Swiss-Prot record:
Keywords: Calcium, Disulfide bond, Glycoprotein, Lectin, Phospholipase A2 inhibitor, Secreted, Signal. The keyword Secreted applies. This is Phospholipase A2 inhibitor clone 08. The keyword ATP-binding does not apply. This phospholipase A2 inhibitor binds directly phospholipase A2 in the presence or absence of calcium. It is found in: Secreted. Disulfide bonds join 83-160, 138-152. Pfam families: Lectin_C (PF00059). One of its GO terms (molecular function) is phospholipase A2 inhibitor activity. Glycans are attached at residue 122. It comes from Bothrops moojeni.
Length: 166
């Protein structure tokens, strides 16, 4: 959409610079102006619709991050590839409300899922006795949102995290 808008503006600039030679009666210029105005309205409408859907999806959880599953069961490496292909991320809750939103997905499906914990995480939700490196080098969340050490070879629910910066 932005590419079309920018292309239209470029054409508009060309016509403004060479207007009389290329478009003596101004019909092409007026058509371009109308087209650019139409694209601007369409872009504003799409942005508004997107923000409405995003706010609705994040309303119940209070989290600006969305946690979505495709209902597949995969190991950590497969999860990484799936989330990357979907232009998402492996879940990495940074706040309690984000962890709750993530846990809501797990609870609905009655399954555990992988997450990643950053080295500088201010928020953690480790279960009692965790982290336990003997259990594995990956981390999984249970249906209550508690974190546990896990083997990266375990097959768990695929959940990807999506967030939007506007």
């Amino acid at each position: 959409m932005r590419l079309i808008l920018l292309s239209s503006l470029l054409l508009l600039g060309i016509f403004l610079a060479n207007g009389d030679e290329v478009d003596p009666d101004g019909k092409v210029l007026n058509s371009l102006i109308y087209g650019v105005m139409h694209l601007q309205r369409e872009f504003a409408n799409l942005k508004g619709a997107f923000l409405t859907v995003h706010r609705a999806r994040s309303f119940g959880s209070g989290s600006e991050r969305l946690y979505v599953t495709n209902k597949e069961i995969k190991n950590f490496e497969a999860l990484r590839q799936i989330c990357e292909q979907a232009e998402g991320h492996i879940p990495s809750p940074q706040l309690e409300n984000q962890n709750k939103a993530f846990a809501n997905v797990l609870e609905r499906h009655g399954k555990e899922a992988y997450l990643v914990v950053g080295d500088s995480a201010n928020f953690t939700n480790w279960a009692a006795g965790e982290p336990n490196k003997a259990a594995g080098t990956c981390v999984k969340a249970d249906t209550h949102g508690s974190w546990h050490s896990a083997s990266c070879d375990d097959n768990l629910l695929v959940v990807c995290e999506f967030y939007f910066i506007l």
